[in-house]
Regions:
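Conserved short loop/turn motifs at secondary-structure junctions
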Residues: 1, 106-111, 188-193, 268-277, ...
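Helical mechanochemical/support elements of P-loop NTPase systems and associated helical scaffolds
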Residues: 11, 15, 84-98, 114-122, ...
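Conserved, well-folded catalytic cores of nucleic-acid-processing
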Residues: 18-22, 98, 105, 125-129, ...
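Long, highly charged, low-complexity internal segments
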Residues: 35, 43-84, 192-304, 308, ...
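Extended, highly charged linker/hinge segments and catalytic-adjacent loops that couple domains
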Residues: 158-163, 174, 309-380
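Short, solvent-exposed helix-loop connector elements
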Residues: 183-191, 377-380
Length: 380
């Protein structure tokens, strides 16, 4: 029997359908020699200071540096402090039972740093020692899943990715816990939350706010002259600027007294502007914020939804490049958009046109290639 664990129930169901695990059970699907179960994102977290004998915020307890970080089920708020999420405990029990009944595990959590951490934390918390392999795919289309299942990767290949995620998780804990307690104790006026990401971000926001608040606009004047040569009209603007209006008026009068402007030289340049690289998550979030006023979280949420609906590749990518084999498929994918009314015009404009290769570079593709459409049409 082979176990397969996905990051979400929806992904687990898609994979289970393809491998023939269609029998529904409480917390997993089974059939055709497989047992397919799932997480709900992060089921396991690092234990809080209380687990190391540190209660309340006390100066003498700082810094809190656990010799070994302990793993506990995800916590939720209770009347007094926190307690393990009952839904998480139930699913962890299911996952353990599935793992215990199987000879090996296929890890199908998201193919990225956090997806790797989700599996490894569960695996380590349960004390599992079964061998596991990795399903590493960049989209959730049936084709991509089948190809991934035919090319399962050794689990140890992603050990460094796990260690990277583990380091990030522990760094967040060390900075967040110690800085929050230190500032709160020093201030003596309640709890002040600090974090590895949130605090530098808040500093940037505050700095920008103060810059805008203290900005004093300064007036200046320039000269402009509109003229024409044949059918070409253009506006010339002085490179000089005057902070006082009388000085600008005096300069304008000198130009008028001269009677005419003479073009002394013309410089011509040929320029070629390359198209932008394909999107990674960051550039997508920036453009969505600029053009649509979307927050970064909203853009990620939409991208994740499109990924789970199988119309877009894996969203949490840091690469703006695609490999040669993916580029070879792009004319067919663009042509498919011609069947979708909203994009038919764009697809027609690219029909028969060689696609630009600026974003094609196997050497610059990281764990995942740039964001692209899949072979599935929206609405299917």
């Amino acid at each position: 029997m082979i176990a397969l664990i996905a990051e979400k129930p929806s992904v687990a169901k898609d994979i289970a359908r393809i491998i023939g695990a269609t029998q529904k059970n409480d917390g997993y699907l089974s059939g055709n020699g497989y047992m397919v179960t799932w997480a709900f994102g992060h089921l396991i977290q690092l234990a809080m200071p209380e687990a190391y004998g540190v209660a309340n915020f006390r100066r003498e307890s700082l810094p809190i540096l656990p010799p070994d970080f302990r793993l506990i089920p995800r916590q939720v708020k209770a009347e007094k402090g926190y307690k393990a999420d009952p839904g998480v405990l139930k699913q962890l029990k299911v996952i353990k039972e599935v793992f215990d009944q199987c000879d090996k595990i296929i890890v199908a959590t998201d193919a990225g740093r956090e997806g790797e951490l989700i599996h490894r934390y569960i695996y380590n918390y349960l004390g599992c020692t079964k061998p596991f392999v990795r399903l590493w795919i960049s989209s959730l289309t049936d084709k991509a899943i089948r190809e991934g299942l035919d090319n399962l990767q050794p689990g140890e290949r992603y050990d460094n990715l796990y260690l990277s995620a583990k380091s990030r998780s522990e760094a967040d804990w060390l900075i967040g816990i110690n800085a929050t307690q230190a500032l709160s104790v020093a201030a003596g006026q309640g709890v002040f939350s600090l974090g590895r990401v949130q605090t530098p971000t808040l500093v940037m926001i505050c700095s920008r706010y103060l810059e805008n608040k203290n900005f004093v606009p300064a007036k200046f004047w320039q000269l402009k002259a509109t003229t024409a040569s044949g059918e070409i009209r253009f506006t010339a603007q002085s490179t000089a600027k005057w902070e006082q209006q009388p000085e600008a008026i005096a300069a304008l009068q000198r130009v008028k007294d001269a009677g005419q402007l003479v073009v002394k030289s013309v410089e011509r340049k040929e320029a070629c502007q390359e198209p932008p690289l394909l999107y990674d998550l960051t550039t997508l979030q920036k453009e969505a914020n600029t053009k649509l006023n979307f927050s970064a979280d909203k853009t990620l949420s939409i991208a994740q939804s499109l990924y789970e609906k199988k119309v877009m590749s894996y969203p949490r990518t840091g690469s703006r490049y695609i490999p040669e084999d993916v580029f070879d498929e792009m004319p067919e994918r663009v042509a498919l958009l011609g069947q979708y009314p909203r994009f038919a015009g764009y697809a027609a404009g690219l029909d028969g046109t060689p696609l630009n290769r600026r974003s094609v570079n196997d050497g610059k593709v990281t764990d995942h290639h740039a964001l692209i459409i899949t072979e599935n049409l929206p609405g299917e």
